[in-house]
């Protein structure tokens, strides 16, 4: 069986994000998937480079961030999906349905992701 080969700094960046935002690493699973990413919901063409999934197990929330190998910038995609997680944790809203992207919300998450990645890279 072949193991997963993560992009450089992928695991370290995940740990950094968990520490920065106080996310319990035992409740977060991160997958780097060679599977085909799903197409964008709505009329826009393209595909999701990453996804955030949620479930409850034994009364405790668990989260899965999937970053697809098709992602052009896997660390940035990881940070973007993590930004969704932080937003959901703050709001308490864990909607599981794929919807067409909200451009203004996605832009704010992209900015947070860029800032988080820059902060991480400055500590290397």
Q: What positions do the PLM features span?
A:
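Charge-rich, solvent-exposed alpha-helical interaction surfaces
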Residues: 13-16, 81, 116
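Post-HEXXH active-site segment of zinc metalloproteases
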Residues: 72, 76, 88-122
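A short, highly charged nucleic-acid-interacting micro-segment common to nuclease
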Residues: 1-9, 102-106
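Active-site scaffold of zinc-dependent metalloenzymes
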Residues: 33-72, 89
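Membrane-integrated ABC transporters
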Residues: 25-35
